[in-house]
Each structure stands twice: as C-alpha cells, then as structure tokens.
C-alpha cells in the first residue's frame, strides 16, 4: 500500500529496539523530513513524541502540544530525539500540526541542532 507522508504529520511508529536513552516502543512521532524526501526516499526523518506528566521537566528542545493534533494526552515533541527510520515503522496516521506549530517546531529544531542559540529565541525581532 502506498502512503503519502507530509512534513508535520504525526503517526504512530514502532521505534524498537532502542538503546540506552533512545525512545523506543510504539509511540507517536512527528515527520520532520521535507516532502520531496518523503516522496522518494525509503527512509524518513522523525522526532519522537511522549506524553507529559506533572513531574515532566521543561527542556529548550521540547515543544509542548497539549491535546492538539489527534493526540489523546498532552504531549511533547522531543527535538533532541531525532532519527531516521524506515517508512515501514510508521503505522497509523494521528494528525497534522498547523503552520504556527510547525514554525515553532522549526525554531526549536534549530536550537536543538545548535544552528540557533537559545538567546536568539528569546530576543524580540528587530526590523
């Protein structure tokens, strides 16, 4: 079956096996890869998503989703947990992030990769 994946889609995925602190098991993931790659590559770049609890700490590499996008629990996209997986690991479509969420994901991703510093994220834009 041919499935068309889009940047910003959320799917359930089987991330097992994981080693050490890698996210593993069946969990939601956010597709980060560009749509050209999504169309032609057998692999796909994702970020793991986890549910949050009252004890969860806030990290600058986390983006909180609350209960948007078809997720049943308040959740966090962990942009320090990026990996390339085979498309066969993707199971069920859950939802899609809106433009505003994806713009914030992009900023958080740039921070996680060290391309944009945390200081720049908190400074107002100057024209």
Question: Language-model segments: what does each one mean?
Answer:
Residues 119-127:
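Conserved small/polar residues in nucleotide/adenosyl-binding loops
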Residues 1-118:
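Conserved functional hotspots at enzyme active or ligand-binding sites that engage polyanionic ligands
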